[in-house]
Amino acid sequence: MILECKNLVIGYENRVVLKGINFEINDGEYVCLFGDNGSGKSTLVKTILGLNSKLKGEINFAKDVSQRSIGYLPQHNDNLTDFPASVYEVVRSGCLNRIGFRPFYNKNEVKRTRNMLKVLEIENLENRSFSELSGGQQQRVLLARALCATDKVLILDEPFTGLDGSTAKKLYEVLDKINKKLGVTLIIVSHFVEDLLKHANKVIHLSQECLFCGNPDEYKKHLKKEYLLSRHQLFEVGDEND
């Protein structure tokens, strides 16, 4: 177990957004955290990261994982596109939690920055201004930055929003590499589930509560069952109206 939610209730100022949240994420898993807009996905992520306070329940981490050691790539923000720093500076800033009260980055953090530039295949961009890059390039830079913060868990909030098909495909390839070769646990928040099911090995479906937690094959069976049930209920209503 790397992350666990038990009987979790979350929301804002006692207004419940999600309740009865129970799931466990294991080391090395590739998780699709799925739900419609407004289903509470981003609220759950912010609560896991400690940016929001939980109302009830527990969030437990493995001994070698903490909220500060989780890499996080938030939803696309237009304000970031004009960020004046270089690509190298943006990626290196992911090491800020590692330096503590030291005034400078050490050799290990510089080495880690270089390594993440290499992993994301953006070494040729390191001296470019972040604001000059395309959307897909900026996404890679921010992903490298998030990886500088973690060896264990990376959370990405709607990373495919605004990307064209070709760019999204390349991002999937990068994420597969991060998960399989680096062994990083991925939690991908999205409402685009179809393509993500081809890559993830666990699905968590939210809608005011945790509707499902299991592998993609089980989830497809769950969807089929829910569809047949809804069709059956629809026909029953139709019969009553006849």
Task: Give the role of each language-model region.
Residues 202-215:
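H-loop (His-switch) and adjacent beta-strand-loop-beta switch element
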Residues 129-133, 137:
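Conserved ABC ATPase signature
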Residues 57-70:
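Conserved ABC transporter NBD signature motif
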Residues 107-125:
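Conserved ABC ATPase "signature" region
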Residues 190-191:
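H-loop/switch region of ABC-family ATPase nucleotide-binding domains
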